[in-house]
Amino acid sequence: MNVIHSAWQNGCKKLEFLGSSCIYPRMAPQPMKESCLLTSELEKTNEAYALAKISGLKYCEFLNRQYGTDYISVMPTNLYGPNDNYHPTHSHVVPALIRRFHEAKVNG
């Protein structure tokens, strides 16, 4: 929120806010749609983080509406990189797929 507010105070016309897929309800139907936002209970284990991300997303929307800024929110889900978790049962989607592709190639 501080970065968004500072950007607005300093005349920044464009901003990209990074959200998270955790802003959607715990039991959102799949495939998930943007319209699911705020329709039911969030996952309790990351609710505070999700609420902070929802606040940022909404703040960008309000500034756009009221002041004509071009602040967008994107949800960069399924990213991977250095130090990612490639555990066979406890990893995210992309690292799990990379591991499985590698194992399939190695094992024929």
Question: What annotation goes with each model-predicted range?
Answer:
Residues 1-5, 58, 95:
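Conserved active-site region of classical short-chain dehydrogenase/reductase
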Residues 1-46, 72:
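Conserved Rossmann-fold NAD(P)-dependent oxidoreductase catalytic core, especially the SDR/UDP-sugar
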Residues 42-48, 62, 88:
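Active-site loop-to-helix junction immediately N-terminal to the catalytic Tyr of the SDR YXXXK motif
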Residues 49, 53:
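Active-site YXXXK catalytic motif of short-chain dehydrogenase/reductase
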